[in-house]
Regions:
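Hydrophobic beta-strand anchors of alpha/beta hydrolase catalytic cores
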Residues: 2-3, 33, 56
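Structural motif
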Residues: 5, 35-36, 68
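Conserved redox-active cysteine motifs that mediate thiol-disulfide chemistry
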Residues: 5-19
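Conserved helix-turn-beta segment immediately C-terminal to the redox Cys motif
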Residues: 17-36
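Structural microenvironment flanking redox-active thiols in thiol-disulfide oxidoreductases
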Residues: 36-46
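A short glycine-leucine-enriched loop at secondary-structure breakpoints
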Residues: 47-51
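Non-catalytic, surface beta->alpha helical segment in thiol-disulfide oxidoreductase systems
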Residues: 52, 57-85
Length: 85
């Protein structure tokens, strides 16, 4: 599962949102994509050590196996995730 931590006021979050929607649709058989509003869920942000938005955590068996901080192009994001799913 890929979880994006985001905020309404975050321009890079708005930029990456459609990319994550595309990835969720294209890889739905192998990857679940979710979003957590960091301003509304500060306890979760703190628990996972999120220091900026957007942050995307890739989870396997409940553990973070990869973290990406900042917006990426679709190609670059998929390249960073390729070894994990």
């Amino acid at each position: 599962m890929l979880v994006e931590f985001w905020a309404d006021w975050c321009p890079p979050c708005k930029m990456i949102a459609p990319i994550l929607e595309e990835i969720a649709a294209e890889y739905r058989d192998r990857l679940t994509v979710g979003k957590i509003n960091g301003d509304e869920h500060t306890d979760i942000v703190t628990r996972y050590g999120v220091m900026g938005f957007p942050t995307m955590n890739l989870y396997r068996d409940g553990e973070v196996v990869h973290r990406i901080v900042g917006a990426r192009s679709k190609r670059r994001l998929l390249a960073e995730l390729a070894d994990h799913f």
